């Protein structure tokens, strides 16, 4: 299980707290380290096993980063684990490796004077860097993608975060042409759409989220 806190829809803040208990007592999220904050789909909440922690102390501070990574337009095919004999082909967003570093305040609310975000795309507020270098590891590791988190990929990602005790994102690593450890293989299979019904049912019963 992982502890998460719903923020302004559709965002959720995940914390670096993993437990085998479905409902740990007296969780104070103010004292926890943030794993990552991201936008999620209703599908993720519907299929994940979610438990409400009624006695938890929420952190209502607006501490989440307003810097994000936005993928390029278009799409492309990538091959993970090349030369391993067990390669996995995936279609991902972005017509070339990398992405844009952008500013996007997740707490922003439309007003009559400003009904959409400032950037012409309407997706974010402004561009900070139009092409993040593929070697800019500090930037790549620090900031989240602007896309939506879905089931079951996000659940597998959270499991990997528990293994590495930090935020990791196999999909983002694919975007930036990074080599992937073997532990990421199931996540990459999910991205590729190559998992079967048996895998899906196992995932449905295995991954749980506490909010």
What spans do the regions from the language model cover?
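Structured alpha/beta reader/binder surfaces that contact nucleic acids or chromatin modification marks
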Residues: 1, 13-23, 46, 53-62
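Short beta-strand-centered aromatic/proline hotspots
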Residues: 2-10
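Surface loops and adjacent helix of pleckstrin homology
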Residues: 6-7, 17, 105-106
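Short solvent-exposed strand/turn elements
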Residues: 13-41
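A eukaryote-biased signal for long
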Residues: 82-211
